[in-house]
């Protein structure tokens, strides 16, 4: 199924432009509040481990979480991270909140990663401009698509293994027949002599 056109953007330490703002590092105990915010735009829930294992920052107005950004993936081995889950409550858009929380997440990630990337819908110029303000630049454009699986998830991988195991079993049986002295099609007769 066709999906939205997306823009992959990236930044490294030399191009990153910090955005001064008062933001807060989110803690796993705040997952309920974060998920309530995300329900306004994503309709998905994150487990508390997403915050514990990732980097999430939020912005509050009168104690209420109104903007947040976090991570999809952090690879310390590849020194690469992917920012995601950026959302600002509809009533607070256009005030730089998404830039602030994305900037805080990016700054922390660039302490241990050489590059940080993110994906954004091509039809979202305010978000693209916010990321450019932080030093992100366009790397590629692509189309996101939904893929429908036609069979069990591992069928393509397990079918060859099943064939190899069946062949192995057949070869072991044939080998046993030869060891017992029966080469007449796999029948064993322990009392027969050549």
Cite the ranges covered by each PLM segment.
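Conserved active-site alpha-helix within GNAT-family acetyltransferase domains
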Residues: 1, 99, 122-140
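Acyl-donor-binding surface of acyltransferase catalytic domains
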Residues: 1-20
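A short beta-loop-alpha structural element at the N-terminal edge
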Residues: 22-33
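A conserved beta-strand-loop-helix scaffold within acyl/acetyltransferase catalytic domains
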Residues: 45-56, 60-87
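Conserved acetyl-CoA-binding loop-helix of GNAT-fold acetyltransferases
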Residues: 88, 94-110, 128-133
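Conserved GNAT acetyl-CoA-binding A-motif
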Residues: 109-119
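Conserved beta-strand-loop-alpha-helix junction that forms the acyl-donor binding cleft
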Residues: 117-128, 144-156
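Short linear motifs in low-complexity or flexible loops
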Residues: 190-192
């Amino acid at each position: 199924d066709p999906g939205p056109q997306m823009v992959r953007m990236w930044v490294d330490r030399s191009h990153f432009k910090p955005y001064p703002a008062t933001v807060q590092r989110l803690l796993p105990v705040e997952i309920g509040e974060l998920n309530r915010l995300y329900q306004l735009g994503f309709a998905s829930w994150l487990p508390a481990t997403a915050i514990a294992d990732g980097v999430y920052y939020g912005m509050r107005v009168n104690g209420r979480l109104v903007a947040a950004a976090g991570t999809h993936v952090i690879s310390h081995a590849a020194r690469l991270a992917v920012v995601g889950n950026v959302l600002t409550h509809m009533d607070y858009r256009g005030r730089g909140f998404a830039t602030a929380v994305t900037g805080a997440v990016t700054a922390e990630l660039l302490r241990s990663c050489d590059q940080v990337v993110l994906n954004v819908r091509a039809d979202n110029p305010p978000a693209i401009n916010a990321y450019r303000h932080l030093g992100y630049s366009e790397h590629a454009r692509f189309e996101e698509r939904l893929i429908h699986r036609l069979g069990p998830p591992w069928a393509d991988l397990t079918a060859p293994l099943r064939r190899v195991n069946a062949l192995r079993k057949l070869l072991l049986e044939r080998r046993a027949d030869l060891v017992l002295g029966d080469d007449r099609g796999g029948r064993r007769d322990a009392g027969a002599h050549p």
